[in-house]
């Protein structure tokens, strides 16, 4: 599977290279060249638990990573979730169901993606024998989830900008009080938009990226 930039000005990449690169050099986002048709697989997929479903789905896009390796990465992504089903479906009454997405380490639904992304980054570090630095700006939950996805992970460092006094006390503690040497939570005097602007200016510097 190849991944193309939304701006169309950079060569396509495989899954692993797209993950390691992040933003495309032309400033676009990487999207898969095509989407698989899951229609015929829906009954089988519906019977899988969350890790098996995640590994099955990911294998359709991460075609440059062996299936056994993908399954191991997915299995390592969710032990910190506090419910054995990871995303339990609760029935409130007949015909009314609620999917619980708050059992991750930061209580945010973004833990589902960012715990897995941390494992994928760790895999890239081991395979490439190169360090990965992650830069981001947040208004709260994304930054905390990203930090906890990379918490203490060898070969990685994460730098998160957030507006001082404009995130919840819980989110600030989740970002600033981890004690992990590879985590750098940086409060700025300004708004979330100011944090994003500063991040874009940093990423535009070729000496940085």
Whereabouts are the PLM-identified features?
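PLP-dependent amino-acid enzyme catalytic core
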Residues: 1-209
């Amino acid at each position: 599977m190849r991944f193309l930039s939304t701006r169309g000005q950079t060569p396509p990449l495989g899954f692993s290279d797209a993950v390691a690169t992040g933003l495309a050099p032309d400033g676009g986002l990487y999207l898969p060249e095509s989407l698989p048709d899951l229609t015929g697989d829906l009954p089988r997929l519906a019977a899988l638990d969350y890790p098996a479903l995640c590994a099955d789905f990911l294998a359709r896009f991460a075609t440059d990573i062996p299936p056994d390796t993908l399954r191991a990465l997915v299995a390592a992504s969710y032990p910190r979730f506090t419910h054995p089903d990871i995303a339990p479906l609760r029935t409130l009454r007949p015909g009314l169901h609620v999917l619980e997405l708050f059992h991750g380490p930061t209580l945010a639904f973004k833990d589902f993606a960012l715990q897995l992304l941390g494992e994928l980054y760790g895999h890239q570090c081991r395979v490439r024998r190169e360090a990965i630095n992650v830069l981001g700006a947040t208004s709260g939950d994304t930054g905390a989830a990203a930090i906890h996805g990379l918490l203490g992970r060898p070969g990685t460092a994460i730098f998160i900008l957030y507006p001082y006094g404009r995130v919840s006390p819980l989110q600030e503690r989740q970002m600033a009080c981890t004690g992990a040497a590879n985590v750098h939570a940086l409060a700025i005097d300004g708004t979330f938009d100011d944090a994003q602007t500063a991040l874009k200016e940093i990423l535009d510097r070729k000496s940085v990226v």
